[in-house]
Amino acid sequence: MSHTILLVQPGARPETRTYCDYESVNECMEGVCKIYEEHLKRRNPNTPTITYDISQLFDFIDTLIDISCLVYQKSTNTYAPYNKDWIKEKIYVLLRQAAFSPNA
């Protein structure tokens, strides 16, 4: 478990910048999915169930002006930066594991 800070800038204006912190990379990736789910709920307020596929999630990530992670590296006592592509790769792995989990 590595402390992870998610940095998000959805719009062109710097005022849209925000961040969240998580106890692990997986928790952070779940947080990115929740951000997208909240976006879908705002766009479709009368839809009782929100469904989407991974390509739609990745398209949403690509529309963000910036999204990146800072992940704590215990060995150096520093945070390492990771970009959109890394985030998408980690989400893909997380969702694939969830899909093949016996409890899914």
Curated annotation (Swiss-Prot):
Q: GO biological process: what's one of them?
A: 'de novo' pyrimidine nucleobase biosynthetic process
Q: Which SUPFAM superfamilies match?
A: ERH-like
Cite a single Pfam family from the UniProt record: ER
For this UniProt record, the keywords arranged alphabetically read as follows: Cell cycle, Phosphoprotein, Pyrimidine biosynthesis
Entry GO CC: nucleus
PROSITE patterns from the UniProt entry: ER
Modified positions (Phosphoserine) in chain numbering = 24
Kindly list the positions at which Phosphothreonine occurs in this protein.
18
| Function in brief | Acts as an enhancer of the rudimentary gene. Has a role in pyrimidine biosynthesis and the cell cycle.
Q: Would you identify the family this protein belongs to, as annotated?
A: Belongs to the E(R) family.
Report what the protein is called: Protein enhancer of rudimentary
